[in-house]
Amino acid sequence: HPRLLLADEPTTALDVTIQAQILSLISSLKEKNNMAVILITHDLGVVAEAAQKVAVMYAGKIVETSDVEKLFANPLHPYTRGLIESRPAGCSAADGDERLKTIRGTVPSLYELPSGCRFSERCDLAENICRQAQPELVEIEEGHFAACFVAERAAKN
């Protein structure tokens, strides 16, 4: 039996019924075969439902990693926060006039990455150091890591 299942966007473009069936199948395969699963997805709803630990990537680099509950309760990296705030959460007809939040700008080309933090050009919190140096992934809270100078400094204060 395989020890690892790598599922790359297994629920993309599927309706919620089929999506639930796919996630159930992955879960049962995991349990039946006692294997690990790496689930690659852009769907935060799938992450919230199916993941235990999560790593958020931006422009090919991990910018935050944590267990899923901590990540959704307290996103530390501005990109993660932007992703969470830009998804529809319990929208109803009453708030149909509200616009979803967006992350300004565009993802940089992997051939022309900025010299500092890859998210710095789109980040509302970016400082000079963010544009000059690449932040390392550091433990900000127990078991919760982020690659962000601003989050690291805020945790120290």
Identify what each model region corresponds to.
Residues H1, Y58-A59, R122, E142:
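Residue-level recognition of short loop/turn positions
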Residues P2, L6-P10, L14-G96:
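P-loop NTP-binding/switch modules centered on Walker-like glycine-rich loops
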Residues D67-N157:
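Charged, flexible cofactor/metal-binding loops and thiol motifs
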